[in-house]
């Protein structure tokens, strides 16, 4: 915190001047008092700076620099409420980019010292937005990361809009052979792929209960909702369907904990969650999930991760119960060029009396991110392959076998930064081949989203 405080002090605009040569004068001028107060607060003489700025503010209540210095001095003296009062006054007086930037940092510093770190993060985002140059912008972003690490609360908001050729995961075919019969059945309505627009929102938050070098314990909460708007073509195919028929909502609470292992390069953790899911506005299932995870730093730029979990699903209404075991192994690293590469593999086994919930699934995926932008875009490419096998299927005696291929290209647009948030555009193409025509699908879409730049 001391390192960050010193950095904040250095940005409070023209505060570090040479000490006034007051010994030759009986009375210091306001400018000399201001200079001396700025030098005093940087040299750890908060009491002197506090007294000098008090006299300056008594002389001229609109003295911006005096309020900035007094806010810093009051904070160093532990008078956090007073520090916040003078930071607010400085913000009200500030005009121009440099002054507003300095006042925003003073507000963030005072709020953080008062324990209001989430509010401090908002003010640091404001400082990023109004920073006069890239260097000061980067400094405010670094300070944001520091405060975020100290904040027990961490909240992420998600929002995206995604036009899609297949919002309901319907078949790309118009007919399908069923039950082993030597002729095809026409697929109608919701059995076929319906195009439209997906609208997705979500919130996840974490409160850190314990934060030590050895252990971290977090309380978790999350909520999400995804709904759709059908295209005119989809309404012609399925006139009785509405986009909300395919909407999904979910909430969960959880607890997670991880421990630093000897050597300082590995962490071992566990997590538990309780959740509920709705589909089409109706309850679909409740679940309990228990998992464990392991992470290890490999060299200066690599990270290996492994996780295993068990989820017990209790179906609502006519939906059957299921038990789902899953395992995930991944490795990510930064290359010498600054580009990033991530590879992973996963295995899922779902056990249920219902054939559509009883399956095994294997997948491999890779992602590659470019360090240098191409034009205005920071690009990341993704590719995944998966196989899903149902030993039993009510439409055939041969079971059900699906193989899927998905490719994505995501473009982040950092030049359109707004308060530290940047827009993203993701192009998605996915196709599934199956031994049953009904389950052959394809989906082409574009997703517009927002993410934090730091």
Listing of model-derived features with the role each one plays in the protein:
Residues 17, 22-60:
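N-terminal leader/linker segments that initiate helical-solenoid repeat arrays
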Residues 5, 24, 54, 66, ...:
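Low-complexity, intrinsically disordered short peptide segments enriched in small/polar/basic residues
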Residues 45-82:
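N-terminal, post-signal-peptide region of Sec/Tat-exported proteins
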Residues 11, 22, 60, 288-290:
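Compositionally biased, intrinsically disordered low-complexity segments
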Residues 10-22, 454:
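Hydrophobic alpha-helical targeting segments used for export or membrane insertion
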Residues 29, 38-41, 58, 74-76, ...:
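Gram-negative and organellar
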Residues 1-12:
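Bacterial N-terminal signal peptides that target proteins for export
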């Amino acid at each position: 915190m001391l390192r960050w405080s010193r950095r904040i002090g250095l940005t409070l605009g023209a505060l570090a001047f040479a000490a006034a040569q007051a010994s030759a004068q009986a009375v210091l001028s306001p400018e000399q008092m201001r200079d001396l107060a700025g030098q005093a607060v940087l040299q750890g003489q908060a009491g002197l700076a506090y007294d000098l700025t008090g006299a300056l503010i008594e002389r001229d209540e609109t003295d911006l620099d005096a309020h900035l210095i007094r806010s810093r001095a009051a904070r160093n003296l532990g008078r956090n409420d007073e520090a916040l009062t003078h930071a607010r006054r400085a913000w009200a007086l500030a005009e121009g980019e440099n002054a507003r930037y300095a006042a925003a940092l003073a507000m963030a510093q005072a709020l953080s010292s008062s324990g209001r770190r989430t509010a401090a993060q908002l003010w640091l985002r404001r400082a990023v937005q109004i920073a006069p140059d890239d260097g000061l912008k980067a400094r405010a972003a670094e300070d944001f990361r520091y405060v975020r690490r100290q904040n027990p609360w961490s909240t992420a908001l998600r929002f995206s809009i995604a036009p899609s050729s297949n919002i309901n995961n319907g078949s790309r075919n118009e007919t399908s052979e069923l039950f082993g019969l030597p002729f095809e059945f026409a697929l109608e309505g919701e059995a076929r792929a319906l195009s439209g627009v997906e609208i997705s929102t979500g919130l996840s938050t974490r409160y850190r209960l314990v934060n030590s070098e050895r252990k971290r314990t977090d309380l978790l909460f999350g909520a999400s909702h995804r709904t759709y708007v059908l295209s005119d073509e989809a309404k012609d195919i399925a006139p009785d369907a509405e986009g909300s028929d395919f909407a999904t909502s979910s909430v969960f609470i959880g607890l997670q904990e991880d421990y630093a292992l000897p050597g300082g390069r590995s962490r071992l953790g566990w997590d538990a969650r309780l959740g509920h899911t709705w589909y089409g506005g109706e309850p679909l299932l409740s679940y309990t999930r228990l998992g464990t995870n392991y992470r290890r730093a490999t060299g200066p730029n690599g990270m290996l991760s492994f996780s295993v979990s068990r989820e017990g699903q209790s179906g609502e209404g006519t939906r059957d119960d299921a038990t789902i075991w899953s395992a995930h192994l991944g490795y990510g690293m930064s290359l010498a060029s600054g580009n990033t590469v991530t590879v992973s593999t996963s295995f899922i086994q779902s056990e249920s009396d219902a054939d559509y919930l009883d399956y095994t699934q294997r997948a491999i995926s890779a992602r590659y991110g470019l360090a240098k932008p191409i034009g205005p875009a920071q690009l990341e490419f993704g590719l995944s392959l998966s196989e899903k096998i149902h030993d039993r299927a009510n439409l055939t005696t041969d079971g059900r076998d699906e193989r899927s291929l998905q490719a994505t290209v995501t473009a982040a647009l950092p030049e359109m930064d707004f308060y530290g948030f940047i827009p993203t555009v993701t192009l998605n193409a996915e196709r599934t081949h199956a031994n049953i025509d009904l389950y052959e699908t394809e989906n082409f879409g574009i997703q517009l989203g927002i993410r934090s730049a730091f």
